[in-house]
Amino acid sequence: KGFSYVRAEYPIAVKRFQIAIDQAKEYGIVGKNIFGTDFSFDIEIRLGAGAFVCGEDTALLESIEGKRGQPRVKPPYPANAGLWQKPTLINNVETYANIAQIILKGSEWYSSIGTETSKGTKVFALGGNVNNIGLVEVPMGTTLREIVFDIGGGIPNGREFKAAQTGGPSGGCIPKENLDVPIDYESLKQIGSMMGSGGLIVMDDTKCMVSLAKFYLQFTVSESCGKCNPCRIGTKRMLEILERITEGKGEEKDLEKLDKLAKNIIRASVCGLGQTAPNPVLSTTKYFMDEYKEHVIDKKCRTNECKKLAKITINPELCKGCGLCSI
């Protein structure tokens, strides 16, 4: 039996997938005695409550079983003891979607697409400061420049490309000097990011990278299941440091603390959520350290996104007394 785990917040996707399952049963592709054989296979949709941690394979299994979504300690691995302690094959639906094409066209056809180590195509959800947003499918090894400028149509309003964030909230930020890096699993890892489920957010030069790192860390702090101390407490301490920095209260030693905390959290966390949560911080401190130092030393945010670092000059002759400068 197969289970498709979908967030309850996606009712249209759930409805459409259920229609597809029902149609497959009508054609005898799914269900009992498929094509008149003694082989039976059913597919059931299970709805998740939206917890980010349930993207981790064993937390997802716990959720399907009706338990709280928390990762299991490995080993044993799902292939040996998965759903209800039975051997379980667990993959993203995008992986399974490739199987039919490989069977129909052969492994050589599939291997001809992509790079030496990352075969096939990848679907990206392209968004952010880019003219053409939406889902795009490209061969592995396509450069970030091709995706952003050739497919995405470039940056709106004549702004400059500053960075792209791949891999969702736990991914890293890629600066413009890496625009021509081929997008595959190995290359992204080498530059401090990850493929994840294919999120790709483009940012222009109006974005503050310190504020961005804080934004993503706020998400992972709130989504931590709390099972292990490094993730539950460590990410919270990192967020507190970033909050101080964006409020003009940061010190130079905070930058060293951030780096040390991040590496300890990666090393000691139980599951992938904690192991990847520091990525936005590590990648922005690696490529945009000048912005961090501006916040800490000069008490300045070049984009004025960090409102407590903004400096406002009031012209008494033009002031209308609206009070907006105090907000």
Q: What do the PLM-derived regions correspond to, one by one?
A:
Residues 1, 144-147, 160-161, 224, ...:
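Extended, hydrophobic alpha-helical segments in both membrane/secreted and soluble proteins
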Residues 3-21, 41-43, 155-191, 286:
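Terminal amphipathic helices with adjacent charged low-complexity linkers/tails
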Residues 7-11, 47-54, 85-92, 133-138, ...:
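Hydrophobic alpha-helical scaffolding
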Residues 14-140, 152:
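Hydrophobic alpha-helical positions that pack around
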Residues 15, 19-36, 180-316:
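Ferredoxin-type iron-sulfur electron-transfer modules in oxidoreductases and energy-metabolism complexes
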Residues 63-75, 177-194:
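Active-site loop ensemble at the mouth of alpha/beta enzyme cores that anchors a bound cofactor
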Residues 118-132, 138-140, 144, 302-327:
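C-terminal accessory/binding modules appended to enzymatic or scaffolding proteins
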Residues 141-157:
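Short amphipathic, charge-patterned alpha-helical segments
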